């Protein structure tokens, strides 16, 4: 690892390069060690942010961290993003504090932030606390008190459903169903100027906002996933979810996927603005749900190329990296947006075998580590320490990148990287890794520091296979003892979600 001759700084650190002048992370030249260090630092800072004077955790009430306490309230999708990252972090680390924080966030929001059952738009979360330290979410940052954002409701709904599958608490299922029922009842076909649900709407009256842009947003990946999972679980009103899902899918194919109107998203922007996040999250959905669109590969590639062409910036081209800007009204490359785009590129490479963008995606992940200080402060470049961009909408991109490319996970450590079912409980012990999935049938990916002596599902020993492809047809596991992703462990089970991965005795 080398410093440029002029020791240029990026974020909190002096830029580091490899022997060819390409950007590597400040934290370590090896991506896995670097990302592991950054994840640990960010999480440590996050869980020690402290509380406000009213006793509520700082993270639950503010969108920006400052030692003197920032005057603004929540970010629009801040709590849903947090649940998303914490779910992945719990599987990766086994830290019970991550799981406990998920419960605290969900319970707080359900107790202090939803529209009334009698409202025109009932049982949906408000995205903002207009009186910051009131302990209540009751409106929209720009439209004002009483307004909510249906797209953020869908995103929070799928995270509630994940938490239900993790904990078994019916409260989270009931709330997720309530969100889905309202969205299914309010869906419209939409058109080029109106999405199937508005971006900002008055909860009590159903009127659209006039103080801020209201009729359209393309941020519906969370809502698609909410409907998908309720249909799979046969919970709530599956038929209504199916109909709403079909209308939403038709609209996405007819409009954003054709005209590239991928805005807006952000709570603090009152006007129209095209965004990276809405586009790239739909590309992620396409790659994870190829059955949704026959042209999934071409359309995912088109979205990723659009993002790069629209929001890529060449200020760091000499280091082989193109950071990604946030949106058209704020053309500043960001830690969350660059790492998200990179993680979707990594998934694209995994799903298609086309690795043309993979090396630069790793450099994009490297670039975004520079915004993290040694103590875990994570600052948007030339801006504030945003609790969306630096925390909930940051960690998940590194964890997803590791899942798509296990060689990016730390070597010599044990980490679960991905599961097709929700991880209810996981323990990384000295003699074994033990975990339990919500579904009896699931597939997991780990990177571990040992070759398993045995793996059981519900006490029944799983067979080892020499090729990962064998798991496409049967239960068992595959372990890579060597190669760039040495320690890769892939497990498939069909009859029990209780898994024990045992080490050799005495190790």
Q: Where are the language model's segments positioned?
A:
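Well-ordered alpha-helical segments within folded domains of soluble proteins
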Residues: 13-23, 71-91, 141, 145-165, ...
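Positions within ordered alpha-helical repeat solenoids
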Residues: 48, 88, 108-111, 115, ...
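C-terminal beta-sandwich/jelly-roll accessory domains of carbohydrate-active enzymes
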Residues: 407-507
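Solenoidal tandem-repeat scaffolds enriched in leucines and small polar residues
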Residues: 161, 169-257
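Low-complexity, Ser/Thr/Pro/Gly-enriched N-terminal "stalk/linker" regions
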Residues: 4-78, 96-142, 178, 182, ...
């Amino acid at each position: 690892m080398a410093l440029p001759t002029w020791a240029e700084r990026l974020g909190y650190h002096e830029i580091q390069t490899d022997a060819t002048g390409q950007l590597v992370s400040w934290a370590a030249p090896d991506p896995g060690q670097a990302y592991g260090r950054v994840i640990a630092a960010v999480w440590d800072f996050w869980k020690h942010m402290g509380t406000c004077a009213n006793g509520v955790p700082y993270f639950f009430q503010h969108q920006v961290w400052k030692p003197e306490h920032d005057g603004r309230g929540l970010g629009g999708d801040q709590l849903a993003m947090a649940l998303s990252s914490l779910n992945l972090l719990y599987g990766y680390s086994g830290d019970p504090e991550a799981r406990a924080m998920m419960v605290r966030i969900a319970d707080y929001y359900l107790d202090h932030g939803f529209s009334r059952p009698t409202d025109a738009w009932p049982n949906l979360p408000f995205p903002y606390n207009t009186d910051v330290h009131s302990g209540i979410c009751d409106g929209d940052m720009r439209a004002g008190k009483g307004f909510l954002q249906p797209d953020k409701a869908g995103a929070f709904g799928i995270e509630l459903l994940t938490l239900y599958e993790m904990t078994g608490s019916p409260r989270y299922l009931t709330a997720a169903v309530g969100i889905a029922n309202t969205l299914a009842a309010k869906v419209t076909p939409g058109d080029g100027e109106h999405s199937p649900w508005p971006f900002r709407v008055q909860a009590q009256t159903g009127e659209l906002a006039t103080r801020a842009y209201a009729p359209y947003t393309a941020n519906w990946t969370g809502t698609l996933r909410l409907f998908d999972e309720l249909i799979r679980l046969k919970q709530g009103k599956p038929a209504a979810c199916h109909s709403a899902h079909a209308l939403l899918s038709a609209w996405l194919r007819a409009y954003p996927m054709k005209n590239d109107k991928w805005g807006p998203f952000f709570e603090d922007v009152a006007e129209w603005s095209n965004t990276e996040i809405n586009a790239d999250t739909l590309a992620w959905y396409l790659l994870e749900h190829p059955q949704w669109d026959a042209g999934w590969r071409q359309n995912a590639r088109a979205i990723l190329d659009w993002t790069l062409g629209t929001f890529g910036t060449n200020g760091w081209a000499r280091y082989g990296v193109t950071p990604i800007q946030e949106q058209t009204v704020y053309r500043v490359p960001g830690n969350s947006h660059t790492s998200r785009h990179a993680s979707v590129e990594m998934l694209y490479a995994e799903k298609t075998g086309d690795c043309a963008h993979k090396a630069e995606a790793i450099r994009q992940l490297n670039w975004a580590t520079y915004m993290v200080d040694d103590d875990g402060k994570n600052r948007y470049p030339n801006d504030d320490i945003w609790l969306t961009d630096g925390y909930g909408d940051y960690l998940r991109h590194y964890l997803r990148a590791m899942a798509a490319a296990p060689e990016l996970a730390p070597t010599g450590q044990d980490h679960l990287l991905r599961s097709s079912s929700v991880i209810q409980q996981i323990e990384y012990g000295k003699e074994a890794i033990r975990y339990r999935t919500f579904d009896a049938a699931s597939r997991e990916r780990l990177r571990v520091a040992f070759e398993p002596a045995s793996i059981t599902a519900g006490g029944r020993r799983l067979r080892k296979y020499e090729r990962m492809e064998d798991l496409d047809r049967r239960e068992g596991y595959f372990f890579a003892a060597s190669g760039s992703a040495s320690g890769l462990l892939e497990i498939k089970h069909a009859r029990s979600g209780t898994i024990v991965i045992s080490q050799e005795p005495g190790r």
